[in-house]
Design a protein with these regions (language model features):
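Bacterial N-terminal signal peptides that target proteins for export
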Residues: 3-21
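Flexible, surface-exposed loop/linker segments and immediately adjacent secondary-structure boundaries
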Residues: 33-186
């Protein structure tokens, strides 16, 4: 298991982000018409990004193509192909961008707009950039990978993970914590 924590300078962060992610200008999103299950919207999508639903036993049930404006629902699996990129914006203003060959599951998202209280927990494989919204100002967002848990409060983090390693770059914010998962055998 390999865990790597990076703290980037402002200039190297700008260079890294500009190389990896598409700059989104003028993306307007309306959150007023969300049902109880809808927690966000796809703000930008490049090539094939899918929303996959698995039942409680893990059996695949449904796959939908994600396009700009697509409503994000909790517990769905958002996946990109080898050329895919997508940016999602949650109703508290949290934005996350996933790179090629990546997968994110929004396990838990609770948000009270009156108090800005709530929490966010997700699973991620591949490349993810998270910009915390109102929920992460008070409570850390949790990003679970196969080998570590990354907590980020009030900031921006880039996480790159696969089955053997997780790298987390703390770009900006209040705090980031990376906790390696222990082997169950010892």
């Amino acid at each position: 298991m390999k865990i790597k924590k990076l703290f980037l300078s402002h200039q190297s962060t700008k260079n890294l982000i500009s190389k990896i992610f598409v700059t989104l200008v003028g993306a307007s999103v309306s959150f007023s018409a969300f049902s109880q299950e809808e927690i966000g919207v796809a703000a930008a999508v490049n090539t094939t990004t899918t929303d996959n639903f698995y039942d409680e036993s893990g059996m695949f049930e449904e796959r939908r193509l994600v396009e700009e404006g697509y409503k994000i629902i909790q517990n769905r699996t958002i996946e990109t192909d080898e050329k895919g990129k997508a940016q999602m914006i949650l109703i508290d203003g949290t934005a996350f961008t996933i790179g090629p060959n990546s997968r994110v599951v929004l396990d838990k998202f609770v948000y009270n707009p009156d108090t800005n209280d709530g929490f966010l927990e997700m699973q991620a494989t591949g490349l993810l950039r998270l910009v915390g919204g109102k929920v992460t100002k008070k409570n850390a967002a949790t990003i679970n990978t196969t080998v570590a848990t990354v907590g980020i409060r009030g900031g921006i983090v880039i996480v790159d993970s696969d089955n053997e390693s997780t790298s987390a770059a703390f770009v900006y914010g209040q705090e980031m914590e990376v906790i390696p998962l222990q082997n169950q055998g010892g």
